[in-house]
A protein has these predicted regions:
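Extended redox/cofactor-interaction regions of prokaryotic respiratory oxidoreductases
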Residues: 172-254, 277-281, 369-492, 501-508, ...
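Conserved short loop/turn motifs at secondary-structure junctions
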Residues: 159-167, 323-326, 349-356, 388, ...
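N-terminal leader/propeptide and maturation segments of large enzyme subunits in energy/redox metabolism
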Residues: 125-132, 285, 290-328, 404-429, ...
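Flexible glycine/proline-enriched surface loops and loop-helix/loop-strand junctions
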Residues: 224, 264-265, 315-318, 347-352, ...
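Flexible, glycine/charged-enriched surface loops at secondary-structure junctions
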Residues: 153-157, 293-298, 345, 376-383, ...
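N-terminal export/assembly segments and adjacent metallocofactor-ligating motifs
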Residues: 1-290, 308, 314, 319, ...
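Long, contiguous, secondary-structure-rich segments that constitute the structural scaffold
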Residues: 7-32, 527-586, 670-686, 690-770
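Short beta-alpha connecting loops at secondary-structure transitions
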Residues: 263-271, 499-501, 505, 515-527
Length: 770
């Protein structure tokens, strides 16, 4: 086998981490005579001013593509010079962001230039050090080590953990190569950490994982209910869409903390943590008792309402008030607000999903939408907001815990269908589901899984209860990490590191929260020997000996055609999309978009998307995806919190996004000097002012936060925005998950990151000095 050669050099662009300037530094900065453009200004002063820019930053062409950070899926104009991206601006008429971008989007290109990019394969040597190697050795080592583990311990002894941040085509190829070619039964994505509860909730209630909305619904609602999400910080462009709403909507925020979003709400329900389910059952009970429900819709389009109505009778207002901390008067006011709204939309994100009862909580919101008929119309819906840029693509096409295109591994007809479409034997397709993420971790702890392949995610930072996660990685016989950076907490512990291209350095598609398929383009060259994930998967298939199975998967565009065929007849059917060019011309296209019928079946014309598509919502026809076309009311009694506060650990820790400028584990965003300066670099903990006074804690004092699993040191942020008895630490810091408690929703197996008991106290003078 020949080695892979490359003549791409790595630019040396080392960044220096600086503190935010004080007044003196700022004055010096403003008066300095030597900056990055000083020479250009002196030599060619006539080229500056009146909007002119120096030649090296002047574009000669522009293209547009979708952002690679969150699930909003904004359109960005990327300005090119000599075929390489030099800067970007938001697309003014892209139907998602309408000319807006958050700080992360503005900095999307700059994070590609970091000096810790993975530029060549690295293999751990006999001294335990990661040392450069060639691609031939790297690919051969991958094959030989994983095959040896399978031969000794069985096929199920190796697994992979994937992501929601590579292209859909890459996800599909990865899952297919691993499961159909390499016999890796077990593979899951980090989307398990953010969206699994919403997926299960939708599947059980609607019959398919189908977020029903379009972003235009933010602007068409007259009542907007936001649950467990701080849109101002986590999804700022979505908050901008709400701000554009011309109907002066009532905005109800359900969140224990007085977040930036809660401050802007017309009603803030500062509930007791994890009392959401009780709250929504109580609201349903009031709506039913007052007759504020859509009986016609319920009778014609749903099942199991009578049992649900009987269930919520167990949640009278006085008991709900006692459990949630929301007084009866406010409960009735919220119910009346929902009743009076003509277009009511219910939105939720991680505060619901990342819970030990996330599925049922999400379904309690779906129940409210169904019983009031607020679905399938503009400005309505039970709407889950996704986290990662391509979590929706992962949910449908990653071939991890579900067969490609929303099919089922355990369904023989589905296996035969996919095998026929891929021209492979159905025997190659597993007839059982993968272990979910937490069970893969458990399998490693029990010695059942010996080899792990991690792609574009950082579990050593992000997985719940880091002490357990670190123990897991140390028990592996072989760990492969495939990433664009060599410095992630997980990559540094790899036995083999495969350098990957990032967003903007490859092609493919993403699917955003509103089901919009958007285009990813190659506008920059990956550094060194880094390759696209698609290319790496193809090479690994070749080295493994299963490359012929994927001979039709020649490139992302060809793979998109394969996925179109797989989607046919499914709720996510997008066979009506002609090609990448049409996606580009239309400003993205939402699924479903089936191909135009022909012949006798052409009674109804297909949707016309020849011009720019603004948005389409699901269930306008009142038909759901269960066999009988009806939606289901699903419910059960709330569970007790697994680890409530105690005498030793009297505070409840919540985690979440702390800044609009940082993203997940900061793998990319920490590379931007601008983004670093927009967020606290030191770990901080929010604590209520009364609690701080009682504990003797002052603002900015260093404190110790401790749980049963670990302890961290942080700076205290004393505030009234968090209620007494609760503390908050942002998820972006590596130490945060040293505290969290590993427990999971029983249906989705999604981790519950937002509830564990901790203590907090100031550091002693001796501890501070050391």
């Amino acid at each position: 086998m020949s080695t892979i050669e490359t003549d791409i050099d790595v630019a040396d662009e080392t960044e220096v981490v600086e503190q935010s300037p004080d007044r003196g530094q700022l004055s010096s900065l403003l008066l300095q005579r030597d900056g990055v453009l000083t020479k250009d200004l002196l030599l060619t002063p006539g080229k500056f001013g009146l909007g002119k820019v120096p030649a090296k930053t002047r574009p000669d062409s522009t293209t547009n593509m979708v952002c690679g950070f969150c699930s909003t899926g904004c359109g960005l104009n990327v300005h090119l010079a000599r075929g390489e991206a030099i800067n970007l601006t938001p697309v003014t008429d892209y139907p998602v962001n309408l000319g807006m971008a958050c700080p992360k989007g503005w900095e999307a290109l700059n994070v590609l230039k970091a000096d810790d990019r993975a530029t060549e394969p690295l293999l751990r040597d006999s001294r335990g050090k990661l040392a450069p190697t060639d691609w031939n050795t790297a690919l051969s080592t991958f094959r030989d080590r994983f095959k040896a583990i399978q031969q000794q311990h069985g096929d199920d002894s190796v697994a992979f953990i994937s992501t929601g941040q590579i292209a859909t085509e890459e996800m599909a190829l990865l899952g297919s190569v691993a499961k159909f070619g390499m016999n890796m039964l077990h593979g899951d994505g980090n989307t398990r950490q953010c969206m699994a509860s919403a997926v299960v909730a939708y599947k059980q209630a609607f019959g398919f994982d189908a977020p029903p909305y379009t972003y235009a619904d933010f602007e068409e609602s007259d009542v907007i209910v936001l649950v467990g999400g701080n849109l101002c910080i986590a999804h700022p462009i979505m908050w901008q869409r709400i701000s554009r709403n011309p109907h002066n909507p009532e905005i109800i925020v359900v969140d224990p903390r007085r977040t930036e979003t809660a401050m802007a709400a017309t009603q803030h329900l500062a509930i007791e943590p994890k009392s959401d389910l009780t709250l929504f059952y109580g609201l349903a009970n009031i709506l039913i008792e007052r007759g504020w429900i859509d009986r016609e819709f319920i009778q014609q389009h749903t099942n199991d309402f009578d049992a649900f109505a009987e269930h919520v009778r167990q949640f009278p207002p006085h008991e709900v008030a006692a459990a949630t901390g929301i007084d009866e008067e406010q409960l009735h006011r919220v119910a009346e607000t929902i009743h009076q709204g003509r277009r009511v939309s219910f939105w939720w994100t991680m505060g619901v999903n990342q819970s030990y009862e996330g599925v049922r909580t999400a379904q309690s919101l779906i129940n409210l939408a169904l019983m009031t008929g607020n679905i399938g119309r503009p400005g309505t819906g039970a709407n889950s907001i996704t986290g990662q840029c391509n979590a929706m693509g992962s949910r449908l096409f990653s071939n991890t815990t579900g067969l490609l295109g929303g099919h089922d591994f355990e369904n023989a007809e589905h296996r035969e269908k996919i095998a026929g479409l891929l021209n492979i034997s159905a025997e190659r397709i597993p007839d059982r589901n993968s272990l979910p993420y937490d069970r893969i971790i458990e399998g490693i702890l029990r010695g059942k899984i010996k080899g792990l392949w991690v792609i574009a995610t950082n579990p050593f930072h992000s997985w719940i209860n880091q002490n357990m996660a670190r123990d897991v990685l140390e028990r592996l016989d072989f760990l492969v990490v495939q990433d664009m950076y060599r410095s992630t907490e997980t990559a540094e512990r790899a036995d083999l590191l495969l350098p990957a291209a990032g967003w903007g350095e490859k092609e493919g598609t993403f699917i955003n929260s509103e089901r919009r398929i958007g285009l990813l383009k190659k506008v920059a060259t990956a550094p060194g020997q880094a390759l696209s994930d698609f290319r790496i998967f193809k090479l690994l298939a070749h080295y493994w000996g299963c490359g012929e199975m994927f001979s039709q998967w020649t490139d992302p565009a060809a793979t998109f055609e394969i996925l179109k065929r797989i989607s046919k007849g499914q709720p996510c059917d997008f066979t009506g999309i002609r090609d990448y060019r049409q996606i580009d011309e239309c400003g993205g296209i939402q699924w479903p978009l089936p191909e135009a019928p022909s012949g006798d079946d052409a009674a109804e014309p297909a949707t016309d998307v020849t011009t720019q598509e603004q948005g389409r919502r699901l269930f306008a026809d009142r038909k759901f995806y269960h066999a009988d076309g009806r939606a289901k009311f699903i419910f059960e009694m709330p569970r007790k919190m697994p680890e409530p506060p105690s005498k030793k650990f009297p505070y409840l820790l919540m985690t979440g996004r702390g800044s609009a400028s940082q993203w997940h584990t900061q793998t990319r965003t920490a590379k931007s000097k601008v983004l670093r300066q927009l967020a606290p670099r030191s770990v901080y903990v929010e604590i209520n002012a009364d609690d701080a006074r009682r504990e003797g804690i002052r603002t900015n004092a260093r404190v110790r936060v401790e749980s049963q699993r670990g302890r961290i040191v942080a700076k205290a942020f004393v505030t009234r925005t968090i209620p007494p008895g609760q503390v908050f630490v942002a998820m972006h810091y590596e130490v945060t998950n040293q505290l969290t408690h590993a427990h999971f929703d029983p249906y989705s197996r999604q981790p519950s990151y937002k509830d564990c008991a901790v203590s907090i106290r100031p550091l002693s003078s001796h501890e501070v000095s050391h």
